Amino acid sequence: MSDNTVLAPPTSNQGPTTPRKGPPKFKQRQTRQFKSKPPKKGVKGFGDDIPGMEGLGTDITVICPWEAFSHLELHELAQFGII
């Protein structure tokens, strides 16, 4: 055997033959879909059952959201974007 024989892979000036792909791209959803329904509001108005408030009616809207959703916890309100 001769000592001049070198076993080496053929050298090439080019890169790999398959193009390299970057990380996968994910599409952002435009709207958020909740699997459960948002909570229902509690009592909205005072009503005629409070003495001295008879003329106000029952469609008085609550200004503060925590009054309308007083039966829920804060994490439940945040889950549905109420607060």
From Swiss-Prot:
Its job: Participates in processes of transmission and amplification of the visual signal. cGMP-PDEs are the effector molecules in G-protein-mediated phototransduction in vertebrate rods and cones.
Transmembrane segments: none
Keywords noted in UniProt: cGMP, Hydrolase, Sensory transduction, Vision
One GO cellular component term noted in the UniProt record for this chain: photoreceptor outer segment membrane
A Gene Ontology biological process term: positive regulation of epidermal growth factor receptor signaling pathway
EC number, as in UniProt: 3.1.4.35
Region of interest (Disordered), residue spans: 1-51
A molecular function (GO) term: 3',5'-cyclic-GMP phosphodiesterase activity
Swiss-Prot/TrEMBL catalytic activity: 3',5'-cyclic GMP + H2O = GMP + H(+)
Taxonomic lineage: Eukaryota, Metazoa, Chordata, Craniata, Vertebrata
Keyword match Hydrolase: yes
Domain notes: The C-terminal region is important in conferring inhibition.
Protein name: Retinal cone rhodopsin-sensitive cGMP 3',5'-cyclic phosphodiesterase subunit gamma
